[in-house]
């Protein structure tokens, strides 16, 4: 009977601490379901499809895009995203070399379960129309230019450092008979040849029920989940979707020889304006990912060898006066076999040749293992795993269950071994030195490797520009006017088909989620008198019994945890602007510096680091002054603060405070250590200058903020000159530099500049307040007449930069084949501004998947991404267009749509407005997704912004009340100025091929357009290779 055919048989049930991992299979179809109950507000789901390809056409990647564009039951593009919005949910997808994951999340169970069958239909029975292929994958427009969302995304991969390196590594490490050899994203040259028929064939081959697993994490009712999954199986059977008897499961071929017969060394070039630094990568083929114990041991050894300032690789290559690279690390890709990879980032060119031999020699000559440090590291690794289970259980279990589905037994036999990390950690604690040396010898010394050296090349960028221009001219001549006209008409019709208006009844049939059903996590908060009005709860009563000689600013958030997170936030407003640029060096320096731990003789930095790592689970010293690509979120802040965050076990609470004190107040200045830090940071800058994600916010930082702001002082474009000067001064007169750093530290050690946040089981902490006295009493200066400082970037904003005539700067980016654009306008400066709900709603509306802007920009292949971002902390609004083949047309199309919405020519759908409001519920549910997230958000609201703890929930009610008229008025005030030639500031990072055309187009729009190189913007000369390092001679 059908009912029997739709049932599920449990094949696995495993327990890890408080988590139970369950997995079931439907025998009639092979469709499987896995579930882990996690204490999170949001439910996460993923349909995982094991995908293998033996060409560079990109079928796995294109399907990831096309499956969203209509299905058999819901045959119109956009219905899936409309339903997801009404469920307070998000949908996404990603493609790796061995699987494609279709991801969804929702703020409450009912909406999540209603969305699952809709998503499943799109995955199992997609339309895969010619029109969707045209706009989403590849097309030639009426100007003869190549475009398409997938094509634009993959275009940059042909010349960027990371992509050309991985491309060479992949084709050198694996034989052509392996699916790992190929680019599943699709090479642009191959995407030109791809057809929708080929994609349909690939879907039929791979997207069979037995090759799909639904993984769900969160507070899910498993009975309801299985009932929903049975409904999906019923549809599978009714539609005759079967796994053919002759079907071959991906990645199960045993005919591939993965042996690397001899060491391989290859060199590749990538596009870059600066030719100062490159990268070196090594790879070995390891054991099967299903050999979980060996893989865990290899990962442990790799991290032990590289992930610390006192690790062998760190000491040899990074933590020296003249470093070989800015960062060195291992990564193990979980495949069959695994790929064990070693990366050296930002390597000065004069040090790049022979670096791989140094690395291989270090591995071969390792005859001893520091077993004391290994013992400490295994304890730390166990604690880190436990903290990840607390903070990020969904992502951890998703990774394991995905691996199990792609490679493991379909009867669940491999799953128990993949979940035994804590047991493996315990077993490794029993290993002797000879066991680690044996592992090292087998997989790194006696095992052949592949090395790829990636070198920067400005000539390559120029050649690409020339080749693209020649191809375009050739294409135009070949097609002729009539051919181009036909292509333009084809694209137009495809867009019209993809953007057909959805039925009102169809959209409304999927009811909107009830916000009252959303579960938000909340901590129990208490605080000292300096931090604000006390709360009325048992935690407040408990901390009030602890008498402190000082009145520190501390907020406590009580949650059920075996660990304690200590965070110290330091307001930097008292530091003179002349010293603020040094903060980046200070933050990195104190993580691994000599210190006065006792007495007057400094403890060497390597001993300090060893003790620190022994006593703590994690350490993070950070400055969060920027967000990549100007993608600011309205709720973010802390841009003018230095933070020191330490996580410890509960019994080490006092040690956590002790280490914050040592890092902040007891580190001592050492010339060699400081030079090492400076040179590491200098080596990173060429890499950052090749990436628009760094350059875009950096440009606005130096234009919109004065030199008192960290945004101005610490961004990529400002730091290069500062670091060069600091390096020169340190070599010639280090005492004056040490005096400057000490002076800067004294400004930070002001009682009123420090705010403290403690998260954990507060009721089990002895002396929760007075423990901090050793830091605050003995090290901090107190001014009784001074209030606690509260500084935001908006305090340093230069509003005059938004002049009467718009300034648009075009920055040539040889490393990119596409362009990025950001426009900025004055924004609001308070989280209580009555306009904020309207602005957030507008930003949500602009970003709706398959909404009007999505269809106009991404749906037309004009850009891969776009968004409106809100920086309340900095007082600025941004409109961003990312990875665009035609940035002017993307901007102009956005402008035309905004004007049409304001005029009423294009109607604002009530359903889209509802979905935009639901996005805000999704955002807040993510901010309070679990107890730790909720605690951090509580501190931000109460102790940074000075708001009430329930302010986010009040804000949701305000968003809910925004009317259509308020929305339209908001578009005029807060969106239309992005498209004016006055009162805004803009920057474009342009591919070389598009500069002239872009300048001409925006000039015609009335903009004052300037083309400036990065060196011109920075006001510095290009540095010669001889100047890049301190040491010159490289004989070590």
Curated annotation (Swiss-Prot):
Gene Ontology cellular-component terms listed: mitochondrial matrix
One Pfam assignment: Peptidase_M16_C
Biological processes, Gene Ontology terms: mitochondrial protein catabolic process
Molecular function terms, GO-annotated: metal ion binding; metalloendopeptidase activity
Highest taxon above the source species: Eukaryota
PANTHER family, per database record: METALLOPROTEASE, PUTATIVE (AFU_ORTHOLOGUE AFUA_4G07610)-RELATED (PTHR43016:SF16), PRESEQUENCE PROTEASE (PTHR43016)
Protein name, UniProt field: Uncharacterized protein C3H1.02c
Originating species: Schizosaccharomyces pombe (strain 972 / ATCC 24843)
Lineage of producing organism: Eukaryota, Fungi, Dikarya, Ascomycota, Taphrinomycotina
């Amino acid at each position: 009977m059908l009912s029997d055919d739709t049932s599920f048989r449990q094949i696995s049930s495993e327990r890890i601490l408080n988590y139970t991992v369950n997995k079931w299979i439907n025998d009639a179809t092979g469709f499987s379901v896995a579930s882990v109950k996690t204490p999170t507000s949001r439910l996460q789901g993923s349909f995982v499809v094991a995908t293998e390809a033996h060409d560079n056409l990109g079928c796995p990647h294109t399907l990831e895009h096309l499956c969203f564009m209509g299905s058999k039951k819901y045959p119109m593009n956009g219905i899936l995203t409309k339903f997801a919005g009404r469920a307070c949910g998000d949908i996404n997808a990603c493609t790796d070399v061995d699987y494609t994951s279709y991801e969804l999340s929702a703020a409450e169970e009912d909406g999540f379960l209603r969305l699952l069958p809709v998503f499943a239909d799109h995955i199992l029975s997609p339309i895969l129309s010619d029109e969707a292929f045209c706009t989403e994958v590849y097309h030639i427009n009426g100007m003869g230019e190549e475009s398409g969302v997938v094509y634009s995304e993959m275009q940059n991969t042909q010349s960027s450092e990371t992509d050309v390196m991985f491309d060479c590594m992949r084709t050198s490490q694996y034989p052509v008979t392996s699916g790992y050899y190929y680019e599943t994203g699709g090479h642009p040259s191959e995407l030109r040849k791809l057809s929708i028929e080929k994609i349909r064939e690939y879907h039929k081959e791979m997207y069979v029920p037995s090759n799909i697993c639904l993984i769900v994490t969160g507070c899910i009712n498993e009975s309801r989940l299985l009932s929903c999954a049975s409904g999906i199986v019923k549809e599978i059977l009714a539609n005759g979707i079967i796994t053919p008897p002759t079907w071959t499961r991906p990645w199960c071929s045993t005919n591939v020889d993965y042996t690397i017969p001899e060491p391989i060394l290859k060199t590749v070039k990538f596009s870059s304006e600066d030719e100062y630094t490159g990268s070196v990568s090594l790879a070995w083929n390891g054991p099967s990912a299903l050999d979980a114990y060996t893989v865990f041991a290899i990962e442990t050894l790799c991290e032990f060898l590289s992930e610390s300032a006192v690790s062998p690789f760190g000491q040899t290559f990074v933590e020296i006066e003249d470093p070989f690279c800015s960062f060195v690390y291992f990564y193990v890709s979980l495949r069959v076999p695994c790929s064990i990879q070693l990366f050296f980032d930002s390597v000065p060119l004069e040090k790049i040749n022979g670096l791989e031999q140094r690395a291989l020699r270090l591995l071969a000559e390792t005859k001893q293992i520091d077993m004391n440090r290994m013992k400490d590291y295994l304890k730390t690794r166990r604690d880190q795993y436990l903290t990840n289970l607390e903070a990020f259980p969904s992502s951890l279990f998703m990774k394991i269950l995905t691996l199990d589905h792609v490679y493991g037994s379909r009867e669940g036999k491999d799953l128990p071994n993949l979940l035994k990390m804590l047991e493996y950690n315990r077993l490794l604690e029993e290993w002797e030195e000879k066991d680690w040396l044996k592992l090292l010898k087998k997989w790194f010394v006696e095992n052949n490797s592949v090395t790829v050296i990636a070198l920067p090349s400005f000539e390559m960028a120029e050649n690409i520009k020339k080749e693209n221009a020649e191809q375009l001219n050739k294409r135009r001549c070949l097609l002729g006017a009539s051919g181009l006209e036909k292509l333009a008409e084809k694209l137009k019709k495809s867009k019209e088909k993809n953007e057909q208006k959805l039925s009102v009844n169809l959209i409304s049939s999927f009811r909107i989620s009830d916000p009252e059903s959303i579960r938000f996590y909340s901590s129990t908060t208490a605080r000292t008198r300096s931090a604000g009005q006390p709360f009325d709860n048992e935690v407040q009563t408990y901390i009030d019994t602890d008498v402190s000689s000082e009145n520190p600013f501390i907020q406590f958030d009580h949650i059920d945890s075996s660990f304690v997170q200590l965070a110290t936030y330091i307001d930097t407003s008292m530091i003179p602007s002349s010293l603020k640029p040094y903060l980046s060096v200070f933050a990195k320096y104190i993580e691994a510096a000599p210190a006065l731990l006792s007495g007057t003789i400094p403890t060497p930095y390597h001993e300090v680091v060893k003790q620190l790592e022994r006593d703590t689970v994690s350490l993070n010293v950070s400055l969060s002054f920027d967000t990549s690509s100007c993608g600011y979120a309205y709720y973010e802040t802390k841009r003018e603060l230095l933070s020191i965050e330490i996580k410890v076990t509960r019994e080490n609470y006092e040690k956590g405070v002790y280490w914050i004190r040592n890092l902040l107040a007891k580190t001592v200045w050492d010339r060699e250590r400081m030079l090492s830090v400076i040179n590491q940071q200098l080596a990173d800058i060429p890499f950052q200058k090749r990436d628009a994600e760094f350059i875009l916010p950096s440009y606005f930082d130096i234009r919109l903020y004065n030199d008192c702001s960290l945004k101005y002082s610490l961004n990529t474009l400002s730091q290069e000159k500062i670091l060069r000067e600091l390096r020169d001064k340190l070599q010639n007169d280090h005492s004056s530099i040490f005096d400057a750093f000490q002076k800067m530290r004294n400004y930070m050690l002001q009682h009123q500049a420090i705010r403290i946040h403690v998260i954990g089981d507060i009721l089990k902490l002895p002396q929760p307040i007075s423990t901090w006295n050793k830091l605050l009493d003995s090290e901090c200066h107190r001014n009784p007449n001074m209030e606690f400082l509260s500084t935001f970037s908006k305090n340093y904003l230069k509003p005059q930069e938004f002049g009467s005539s718009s300034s648009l700067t075009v920055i040539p980016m040889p490393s990119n084949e596409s362009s990025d654009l950001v426009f900025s306008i004055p924004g609001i400066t308070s989280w209580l501004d009555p306009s904020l709900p309207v602005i957030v709603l507008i930003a949500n509306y602009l970003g709706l998947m398959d909404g009007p802007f999505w269809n106009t920009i991404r749906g037309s292949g004009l850009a891969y991404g776009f968004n409106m971002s809100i920086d309340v902390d900095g007082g600025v609004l941004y409109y961003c267009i990312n990875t665009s083949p035609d940035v002017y047309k993307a901007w102009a199309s956005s402008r035309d749509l905004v004007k049409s919405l304001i005029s009423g020519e294009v109607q604002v759908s009530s359903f889209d407005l509802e979905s935009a409001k639901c996005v805000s519920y999704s955002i807040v549910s993510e901010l309070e997704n679990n107890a730790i997230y909720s605690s951090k958000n509580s501190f931000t609201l109460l102790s940074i912004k000075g708001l009430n703890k329930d302010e986010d929930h009040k804000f949701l009610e305000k968003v809910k009340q925004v009317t259509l008229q308020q929305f339209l008025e908001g578009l005029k005030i807060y969106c239309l100025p992005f498209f004016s030639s006055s009162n805004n500031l803009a920057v474009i990072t342009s591919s070389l091929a598009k500069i002239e055309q872009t300048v001409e187009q925006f000039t015609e729009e009335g903009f004052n357009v300037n083309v400036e190189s990065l060196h011109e913007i920075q006001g510095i000369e290009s540095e010669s290779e001889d100047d890049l390092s301190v040491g010159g001679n490289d004989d070590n």
